[in-house]
């Protein structure tokens, strides 16, 4: 008898594979996420979620997609892998398997391959029972987690948050957070249960003196510090709003895993202990809230968290020999501090004051933060746009941001795993960040003060990395062309947002010093372009005029002319340079499709780079000399299509400076960027630089490509990478120019990479976590709707390519919803007041 083989399943598989292959343009279709934009995360999309909770410049902790606490960064620096053993639990009396940690299942990536996992993850709470299912919803600054388990007859919701109130920077800079645990009885009987919250004293330091202190309805994890290390001292408080809270201030003291074992034994029995505090070295603590729920009833337990770490060892920057008295006239100025101190250390004397303020003002701060949430999410904008903007507002709550006692901001570019990354409120990175100037304009203006006063010398040279504490800093390195010229445009923007003429009058002379330095240094022959080598955000110097930095130059010239005319100043010099530069950019630097760079390295004021090879002490390899002679200086882009190639016109547009360069040619450049640099699949893309931003079957926008040839052997050092901050910049600019769908394509590709499976949706990284450039995403509001408020003229501008819409706007004095209904503009105020004399419809 011959066996018959059924080939039907095999044929079906082959046909399916061929269809997938053909429908993906010759690429195997990627494993697309089930996550819908601006909606719930569940399943594997929970794995990498870590949502920052804290205050601006105050530190943070993160609420993970499961409900776990991690990234505990309250010691004035990031601690990305600091996941202390702290957890909430519920124990329902009288049922089997009724005790569980109030979290979803531990993600698989934590079980093996991370530090300590090879030894079994000792000391973590991973081994305790958890809920079968979880789902996570971000509604910044709130994160909501629903937990479900067939063993537990309760509907359970966790809500984590920290105060965030646009126009109220102080209450948005508090070292606090909260998690509300809500329980609803789904049965027809009373449910008796005990809620608990447990923690080791993760504030303790080696050779320090740590204690767990008493606090009404809670506890304080305390470290008095290590000798000669005041920055090691600090307090972390956890407390509830429940008068019946019971606290065990000292777990069982023993070896091995005795303390955690005994603590869990108590929790598991639905019991509680009330051990008093001990003098030192208590291994851990647990608070308990026993409660009874009638059928259908709901109980919410408010868990409030506060911390106080007043000292640091942070100091950056070389002191300037030029010290202007005007910088330090203010007795509250932080410039004379030996080390940085956080803003809250000047407002509160200790942890008890923070606790009292948080407890007293909790409901008011919740109401105002929830108002912002509700107004922001009351929108008709595409979900992917709202997700992108809101996800990157978390940067403001991350350790990327610091704030001095005098109120001034100082920022990193991003966060390395255990320290800030790239110091000094770097001007050419923070150029892109558009959230702060609209949500907290007064804080943003402190950055202008830093740039144009302590960071600018008498010649007008601006150090693009300011000192910490903020003080006069030596200008011994190159100025950054894009950073310094962008700062001039940002002065214009901040003036139009605030409407503060006196502020403009005061800073304008410093702005004149700055532009004159730029002209003298980079355009000494008055061509209207930057010919001399000019440092920029790619951490190299461009030699010869290029579209990117020349567009900054034109924007700065136009900004200073507009401000000068308003102040009745003579700006004819700048107007003439602008005209010459615009003509040069639109002809000499435009190849008919996009803007390019004309590489120059001979006949400049700058020394010929070939001279370096004549000095034997430089010890430069021979192959580098040959490459210079063949191609010119390293790290240029030449004939390339640069995604940032008209960046200055985008900065100008978000600042309210329109038509800096011919809009038809700008649009042509942006469409070329979309055509040549946007890749839906990067599998065949070669990147010897930093590939993990986007790689393999992921999509993304490359920084540069050379569609017409001419790629140099060593183009600028990041040219093959994908940066989210540039993706949003290009996307919002495309939208402004009427190419809305192309912009949305780029935003979707970006957010698809940050869907929680591989990357944290709330941590867009570049040179570090929570990278500031990603706040270019805030410009998507203006890009999609054309909404911009001018406080000088009290006019609301709307340039809608989409018809009727509802969106969000925040200004110096308030926030609300803005849009069009039946073709007519409207503004619905929610907080504060925005005076609108008239709407300008473009």
Regions found by a protein language model. Give the residues of each.
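Non-catalytic C-terminal accessory modules of carbohydrate-active enzymes
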Residues: 57, 68-70, 76-158, 163-169, ...
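Aromatic-rich carbohydrate-recognition surfaces in CAZymes
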Residues: 91-94, 98-102, 110-121, 185, ...
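C-terminal substrate/ligand-recognition segments
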Residues: 178, 289-294, 301, 422-429, ...
């Amino acid at each position: 008898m011959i066996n018959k083989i059924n080939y039907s399943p095999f044929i079906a598989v082959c046909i399916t594979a061929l269809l997938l292959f053909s429908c993906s343009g010759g690429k195997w279709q990627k494993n697309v996420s089930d996550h819908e934009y601006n909606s719930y995360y569940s399943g594997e999309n929970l794995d990498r979620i870590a949502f920052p909770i804290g205050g601006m410049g105050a530190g943070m902790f993160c609420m993970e997609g499961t409900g776990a606490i991690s990234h505990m960064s309250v010691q004035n620096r990031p601690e990305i892998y600091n996941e202390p053993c702290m957890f909430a639990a519920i124990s329902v009396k009288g049922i089997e398997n009724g005790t569980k940690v109030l979290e979803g299942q531990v993600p698989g990536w934590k079980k093996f391959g991370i530090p300590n996992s090879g030894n079994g993850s000792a000391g973590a709470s991973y081994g305790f029972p958890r809920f079968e299912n979880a789902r996570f919803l971000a509604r910044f600054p709130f994160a909501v987690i629903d937990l479900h388990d067939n063993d537990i007859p309760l509907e359970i919701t966790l809500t984590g948050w920290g105060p965030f109130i646009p126009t109220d920077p102080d209450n948005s800079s508090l070292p606090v957070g909260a998690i509300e645990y809500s329980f609803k009885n789904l049965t027809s009987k009373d449910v008796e249960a005990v809620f608990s919250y447990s923690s080791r004293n993760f504030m303790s330091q080696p050779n320090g003196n740590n204690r767990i202190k008493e606090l009404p309805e809670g506890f304080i994890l305390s470290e008095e510090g290590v000798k000669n290390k005041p920055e090691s001292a600090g307090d972390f408080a956890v407390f509830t709003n429940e008068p019946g809270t019971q606290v065990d201030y000292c777990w069982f003291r023993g070896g091995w895993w005795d303390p955690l074992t005994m603590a869990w034994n108590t929790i598991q029995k639905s019991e509680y202990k009330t051990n008093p505090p001990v003098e030192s070295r208590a291994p851990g603590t647990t608070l308990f809230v026993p409660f009874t729920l009638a059928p259908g009833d709901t109980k919410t337990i408010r868990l409030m968290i506060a911390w106080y770490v007043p000292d640091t060892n942070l100091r950056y920057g070389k002191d300037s020999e030029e010290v202007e008295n005007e910088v330090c006239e203010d007795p509250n100025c932080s410039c004379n501090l030996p080390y940085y101190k956080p803003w809250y250390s000047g407002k509160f004397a200790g942890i008890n004051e923070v606790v009292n303020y948080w407890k007293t003002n909790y409901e008011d701060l919740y109401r105002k933060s929830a108002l912002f949430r509700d107004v922001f999410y009351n929108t008709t904008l595409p979900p992917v746009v709202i997700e992108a903007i809101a996800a990157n507002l978390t940067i403001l709550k991350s350790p990327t941001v610091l704030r001095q006692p005098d109120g001034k901001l100082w920022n990193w570019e991003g966060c390395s795993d255990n320290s800030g990354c790239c110091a000094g409120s770097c001007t050419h990175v923070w150029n892109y960040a558009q959230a702060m100037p609209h949500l907290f304009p007064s804080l943003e203006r402190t950055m202008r003060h830093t740039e144009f006063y302590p960071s600018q010398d008498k010649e007008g040279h601006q150090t693009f990395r300011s000192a910490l504490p903020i003080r006069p800093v030596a200008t011994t390195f190159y100025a950054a062309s894009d950073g310094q010229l962008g700062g001039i445009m940002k002065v214009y923007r901040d003036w139009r947002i605030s409407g503060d003429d006196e502020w403009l009058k005061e800073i304008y002379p410093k702005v004149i010093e700055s532009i004159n330095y730029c002209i003298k240094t980079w355009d000494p022959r008055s061509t209207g372009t930057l010919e001399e080598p000019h440092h920029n955000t790619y951490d190299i110097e461009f030699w010869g005029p290029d579209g990117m930095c020349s567009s900054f130059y034109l924007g700065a010239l136009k900004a200073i002319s507009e401000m000068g005319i308003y102040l009745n100043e003579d700006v004819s010099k700048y107007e003439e340079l602008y005209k010459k530069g615009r003509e040069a950019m639109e002809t000499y630097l435009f190849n008919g499709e996009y803007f390019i760079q004309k590489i120059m390295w001979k006949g400049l004021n700058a020394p010929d780079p070939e001279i370096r090879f004549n000095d034997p002490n430089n010890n430069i390899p021979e192959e580098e000399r040959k490459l210079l002679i063949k191609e010119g200086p390293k790290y240029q882009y030449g004939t390339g299509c640069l995604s940032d190639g008209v960046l200055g016109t985008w900065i100008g547009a978000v600042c309210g400076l329109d038509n800096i360069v011919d809009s038809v040619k700008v649009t042509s450049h942006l469409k070329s960027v979309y055509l040549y640099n946007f890749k839906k699949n990067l599998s065949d893309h070669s990147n010897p630089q930093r590939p993990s931003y986007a790689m393999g079957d992921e999509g993304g926008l490359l920084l540069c490509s050379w569609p017409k040839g001419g790629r140099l052997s060593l183009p600028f050092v990041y040219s093959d990478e994908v940066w989210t901050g540039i993706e949003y910049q290009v996307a919002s600019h495309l939208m402004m120019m009427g190419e809305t769908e192309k912009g949305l394509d780029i935003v979707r590709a970006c957010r698809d990479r940050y869907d929680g499976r591989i990357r944290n949706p709330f941590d867009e990284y570049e040179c570090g976590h929570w990278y500031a450039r990603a706040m270019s995403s805030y410009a998507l509001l203006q890009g999609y709707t054309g909404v911009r408020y001018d406080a000088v003229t009290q006019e609301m501008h709307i340039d809608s390519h989409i018809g009727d819409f509802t969106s969000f706007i925040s200004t110096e004095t308030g926030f609300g919803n803005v849009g069009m209904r039946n073709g007519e503009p409207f503004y619905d105020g929610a907080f504060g007041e925005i005076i609108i004399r008239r709407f300008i419809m473009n």
